[in-house]
Amino acid sequence: KVLYETGCFDDVYEITGEVSQKIRDSLEFPQTGPIGCNKFDSDEKIYYVDLNAAYMRFVQYIPTGIPNEDGEFPGRNYTVGKVIQQLYDIRKASNPKLAMTLKLLMNSTWGYSIKKPQEMKSKHYEKVDNFVERFSPFVLKYEFTQGQSGLVTTLKPIVEHWSYPQFAKAVLDNYNEFFSEVKSKVKVYYENIDALMTNEEGYNKLIEMGMVGEKMGQFKLDKIFTEVHVLSKRKYWGVKEDGEIVKHCMK
């Protein structure tokens, strides 16, 4: 509602059908894991940095107007980028509860933009047998919960699906462009969505490029490892400068 009332969605259309599916199919999501190999081991100094505000740095605009058959849009609404920056500034200066509220607000907007069609529905019925007999071609499964009543899952005969995947497309395109540029100039050993591992030379290069700091979209130093072992896309462990052992496992 905040984004709507501030004009972020002016001239932004929800779409459906083949064009919407084509846009969703073209989305390139962030990758996690060591670069160019399955495992990575190092006993040199490794810097682990992550991006302030994560994906919010890449929320710059929402494509506007009616798309052509290739999913291309005639315009862009840049208001959302300004609003996100304002929300980020408020979030940094406010209490933790408000900060979490703002984070959930922005994440829900992102999630809605890439939601998938809901082809099934589950509903409770008083007389399951009667419903199943009448609509058997659409019934996927059912279970009795008490007496003759129970839960029935059916396939929807008509699936209405409207969303604005062009928003997710714009965010991910900005993300991929940003990290492609970073990796073209800095040695990256491991990436984890909005974070990466680089060596001392790479970290100093990020500083020279003005990419380390407290602003949204800048990297902040999270850890310095004297030894690190990346075991898979989701697991790594390392030893920090103070001797602390860090074990990381993504769920």
Regions found by a protein language model. Give the residues of each.
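Conserved acidic
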Residues: 1-251
